[in-house]
UniProtKB/Swiss-Prot annotation:
Name under which the protein is recorded: Ribonuclease PH
Family recorded in the similarity comment: Belongs to the RNase PH family.
Molecular function terms, GO-annotated: 3'-5'-RNA exonuclease activity; tRNA binding; tRNA nucleotidyltransferase activity
The EC number(s) this enzyme carries: 2.7.7.56
CDD domains from the UniProt entry: RNase_PH_bact
Keyword Nucleus listed: no
Keywords: Nucleotidyltransferase, RNA-binding, rRNA processing, Transferase, tRNA processing, tRNA-binding
Subunit structure: Homohexameric ring arranged as a trimer of dimers.
Superkingdom of the organism of origin: Bacteria
Gene symbol of the encoding locus: rph
GO BP of this protein: rRNA catabolic process; rRNA processing; tRNA processing
InterPro entries, sorted: ExoRNase_PH_dom1 (IPR001247), ExoRNase_PH_dom2 (IPR015847), ExoRNase_PH_dom2_sf (IPR036345), PNPase/RNase_PH_dom_sf (IPR027408), Ribosomal_Su5_D2-typ_SF (IPR020568), RNase_PH (IPR050080), RNase_PH_bac-type (IPR002381), RNase_PH_CS (IPR018336)
Biological role stated in the UniProt entry: Phosphorolytic 3'-5' exoribonuclease that plays an important role in tRNA 3'-end maturation. Removes nucleotide residues following the 3'-CCA terminus of tRNAs; can also add nucleotides to the ends of RNA molecules by using nucleoside diphosphates as substrates, but this may not be physiologically important. Probably plays a role in initiation of 16S rRNA degradation (leading to ribosome degradation) during starvation.
Amino acid sequence: MRPADRAAQQVRPLTLTRNYTKHAEGSVLVEFGDTKVLCTATVEEGVPRFLKGQGQGWITAEYGMLPRSTHSRNAREAAKGKQGGRTLEIQRLIARSLRAAVDLKKLGEFTITLDCDVLQADGGTRTASISGACVALADALNKLVASGKLKANPMKGLVAAVSVGIVKGEALCDLEYVEDSAAETDMNVVMMEDGRMIEVQGTAEGEPFSHEELLTLLALARGGIETIFQAQKAALEQ
């Protein structure tokens, strides 16, 4: 039996609170159960040096965890003097995922930075960051259009992500920490609104998984992500 008696295919209670902070062009507090991430989108004129003069924009991301977002305190990475490998991997994943949602040529020479700060971690922080940052990005792009800085919205569609895994032989969707830490197989899936996949990260933590189990996990992920898309659309309509 899962925590809170969730069904195998069920996503945790999901909340997307827009305009959570007043300064950023887009800001969203995303909550998947007890996992809470603040996602902000900042728009700046100009692009990185390698893109100058090409007439296209750029989307990048930063990810971090507050020291007490976990059960015991983790020192800030700034205090250590460098970011860890996990942090770098996650923020690159977030940026890749959100770049897939935008026509960078139509964005023009703007850079949008997505900051994802984990306030409380209970599994699935990277997938929650992607799903929340997508809504913050949509708000930032809408403001660029409304201000007249862009003629048309360059967003191609929504992006969402979810974790799936095999725990004690059972395929489960949207793992919380107690499940993730016991998973034989752990997978993160990122998808576009039209059903195309952006990224699949799968690892056999214990037993290797079969082709049939892979297909089962992908189907679970697609169902969970459809639920997230519905929540994103509902939030953006408010």
